[in-house]
Each structure stands twice: as structure tokens, then as C-alpha cells.
Amino acid sequence: MATFKDACYHYKRINKLNQTVLKLGVNDTWRPSPPTKYKGWCLDCCQHTDLTYCRGCTIYHVCQWCSQYGRCFLDDEPHLLRMRTFKNEVTKDNLKNLIDMYNTLFPITQKIIHRFINNTRQHKCRNECMTQWYNHLLMPITLQSLSIELDGDVYYIFGYYDSMNNINQTPFSFTNLVDIYDKLLLDDVNFVRMSFLPTSLQREYALRYFSKSRFISEQRKCVNDSHFSINVLENLYNPNFKVQITRNCSELSVDWNEACKLVKNVSAYFDILKTSHVEFYSVSTRCRIFTRCKLEMASKLIKPNYVTSNHKTLATEVRNCKWCSINNSYTVWNDFRIKKIYNNIFSFLRALVKSNVNIGHCSSQEKIYEYVENVLNVCDDKRWKTSIMEIFNCLEPVELNDVKYVLFNYEINWDVINVLIHSIGKVPQILTLENVITIIQSIVYEWFDITYMRNTPMVTFTIDKLRRLHIGLKTVDSDSGISDVE
């Protein structure tokens, strides 16, 4: 059983504040929820289990029981998950306030101990102080957290997470902030709490405390497309698709890292809860993570033989050719932007090949093919530039004054002509490696300009950012025909 979940279940009965703050979906009646997919720790109840996606950020971080309350660590309502979430620079005072909140919600005193023991001793087999009956008293106060970086902001979700060695398929990584506070001060807090426990429970408490307060922080993970809801990934190739998210909000006016102080003023806390409401947003999927996902998918379907072919049609419209016809049944081709990028890049590359190398048919086997397969994914900059350089070298360039040149005198489509004029000011007859890199980048950037594109989608924005963008009508990008250049 998850210690944090047990503590919330038992401690919520001691007063009105706890009854409100410690209410977890995992301790209530189960309701239908989206199917689970990943293994990890539920941020709401801290148990290690199968996770489903959050309705507030679409990341897999909530269990099927807790999903009924729809709580997200990015909410603006002072529920327990939000009060345990700290952002960016965490100070010693912030951690002191967190420890005070734990002591307020999960006190260990002689009175509390007697109360729990009396409630538990309903049968002779429960007379002994065994851990299975008093698991809720064995939750030490630690500065253990799960952290995640989202577009430059680092979030720390504090809690008591059991079994840290279990499989973790989420983008969150364990971080220990005890050095920011003070190990000896934290030891003192826990030794005082432990002194009230029966002797038979003190050893278990001490073991749990030291194992969760002396661990080495993990390396922070990179967020990728697989960490988001499968519903989002399945609709990425629809340019008009918008993600629907819900956020729990209230008139919370305190600084982000000071929300945990609200439990000290019960009347003020309940006044804020009276303003609680849910806000709905439709946001764009436009970001580097999802753009990379689409370009990588298209890269797997590339037919490089087209660059040596004599077909009169665009690369995506070739039919009945064993070497050049692509499989149009894949959903990635539903995105007209991917098709345009594919057609224009292959029109340009074929013009380069035909201008410089004597290859007459697409059935021939050429070394250049292995480098063409990486030409779409500009998000992997180092690998992409290496591929372009190898393609350039396969064109047998001529060196003049330490600069290599290739010819460019083959027919291209009008879209590529416009890109050439926009990127280098004319339709040239000779090109350098830098020109080739610039032109292919411009073809992709016309629709997916990753230079200024945010890394993670808008679903990971805080509520104040979402509100500002919503007022400016910027939560939805115009993807239905308007390019980044336009």
C-alpha cells in the first residue's frame, strides 16, 4: 500500500481542513477513466501503478482512480497536489513552509498516536503495533520530489514516493532538495516525530526516512512525444486538430512557491476554495516535440530513388513505380504541409542530382540514397547537416578557391522557385554547400519554423500564460493553409 495514500485516508478524519485537503480520488469510489498505459508514480496519491493521461496537460501522471478529480500540478486551485508543486528557484524558506504544511496536515503527537491506536484495535490480531496497521504513521517528512522541465521552467512535485527503484515510464525524475534546506534540521524534525511512535515502529520510520532523504538525484529526463496522450498523437496529422484541456482555477494570488502556506490560515483557505471553477481551453499542438514526431514518421516512408528518376509528377503522386511510389495510406500524409515539404525537397534534390551526376533511372542503386533518408528531420540538427554534406559530396562538386560548387540547371516546380528567390534572392545556376543547407531549411521552415518554435506544446503552460494567450487569440495557431513565412 502507498504510504502517502494511506496517510491521506486516515488523517483526513482528524479535522475539517484535512477532510478537504486530503481528499483523494484513490480513496473514494472508483469511476470509469481513460485506459491506463504507462508505469510510474501518480502525482496525486504518490502510489506506483498504471497511469492514465491528465486532462489538464495530457501527460501520463495520474492513476485511474485519481483521474476522476482531474487535478494537475499546473492548476491554479490550491488543492494538495498544487500546494506540493514548486517551480524553478526553490529557497530554504520555501522548503520550511512545505515542512510546516506537512506537520499541519500529518501531525504526530501523543494524542494522535492514541487516537489511531484506539481506532485500529478492533480485534486481538491488531493489538500489536505492526506496520500494516500503522502504515499512515510511518510517512516521514522528506524533501523527495519528482521533477520535470517544461520549456525552461522546472517543476518539483514533492511527496512521499515508495519503491523508487520501480519502473518509471514518465518524464518525471527523482530529485532530492535536502541540501538546499539542511540535513540536520530535517533530521531533527523527523526525530521529534519519531519519538512519539511506539518503539516497534520507530525502526521502520527511521529506515524509511533515511532511504528517502539521502538518495542521489537522478538526471533530468527529456520530454518526448510518447509522454503525451495517445489521443493527441493519433490526431497530430490533422492540421486543424486542437487539444481540449481543463484546468482547476481559483482566485489564487500568492506566489507559486508559497501556496503551501495557505493551510496556516484556514478561513482564508476556504474563502479561496469558494472561488474554485474549471476553465476549458482549446490549444494548438504546434511545438518542436510533435513536429519532430511528424518529420521522423515521414522520414521512415521516404523513397530516395525519386532523386534519380524521370517522373513528371510530384514525389507523393508517383503511381505504379516499384522504387518511387510511397504508401499514401499512412496518416502522416493527411497533413498537407508534410506533403508539400516532401515534394519540394525531392524536386530540389532531383534537380541537383540530374545537374551533376549521370544517372538515368530510378531503378539504379546509388550511394546517395542512404543519405537522402535523413533529409527531412531538421530537428536533429547535427545528423541532418551531416546528411546534407554527404549528399553534396555525392554530387562530385568542383573546388575553386577552397570553396566547392555544384551545378543547378534542371527543371524544378514553382514552389521551389519561390523558396529560392525568398532564401537566396534568385534562381542560381551554381550552388555551394551553404546554399544547399539554406534552401532545404527554408523549404521545411516555410511550414515548420523550429527556430522560434516552443519545445513542448501549450498544454504544459501555466494557467496565467494560457489566459494571456487566450485573450490575444493565440492559443490556436492558424494551420489551415497559412505558412510560417506568410
From Swiss-Prot:
The segment annotated Zinc-binding domain runs over: 42-79
Predominant location = host cell
Its localization reads:
Host cytoplasm, Host cytoskeleton
Alphabetical list of InterPro entries matching this protein: Rotavirus_NSP1
Listed disulfide bonds for this chain? none
What are the top taxonomic ranks of the organism? Viruses, Riboviria, Orthornavirae, Duplornaviricota, Resentoviricetes
Question: What is the documented function of this protein?
Answer: Plays a role in the inhibition of host innate immunity by inducing the degradation of key host factors required to activate interferon production such as IRF3, IRF5 or IRF7. Associates with components of cullin RING ligases (CRLs) including CUL1 or CUL3, which are essential multisubunit ubiquitination complexes, to modulate their activities. Recognizes the host NF-kappa-B regulator BTRC through the presence of a DSGXS motif in the C-terminal substrate recognition domain.
Subunit field text: Interacts (via C-terminus) with host IRF3; this interaction leads to IRF3 degradation. Interacts with host IRF7; this interaction leads to IRF7 degradation. Interacts with host CUL1 and CUL3. Interacts with host BTRC.
- Posttranslational modification, per the record? The C-terminal region is phosphorylated by host CKII/CSNK2A1. Phosphorylation of the DSGXS motif is essential for host NF-kappa-B inhibition.
pLxIS motif, short sequence motif: residues? 480-483
Q: Which organism is it from?
A: Rotavirus A (isolate RVA/Human/India/116E/1986/G9P8[11]) (RV-A)
HAMAP family membership: ROTA_NSP1
**Has the keyword Phosphoprotein been applied to this entry?**
yes
Q: Please report the name of this protein according to its UniProt entry.
A: Non-structural protein 1
* IKBKB-like degron (ILD) motif, short sequence motif: residues: 479-483
Similarity remark: Belongs to the rotavirus NSP1 family.
Listed GO CC annotations: host cell cytoplasm; host cytoskeleton
Q: Where is this region: Interaction with host IRF3?
A: 317-486
**Entry keyword Transmembrane helix:** no
Stretch list, region Important for cytoskeleton localization: 82-176
What does the UniProt keyword field contain?
A: Host cytoplasm, Host cytoskeleton, Host-virus interaction, Inhibition of host innate immune response by virus, Inhibition of host IRF3 by virus, Inhibition of host IRF7 by virus, Inhibition of host NF-kappa-B by virus, Inhibition of host RLR pathway by virus, Interferon antiviral system evasion, Metal-binding, Phosphoprotein, RNA-binding, Viral immunoevasion
Q: What is known of its domains?
A: The integrity of the zinc-binding domain in NSP1 is important for degradation of host IRF3.
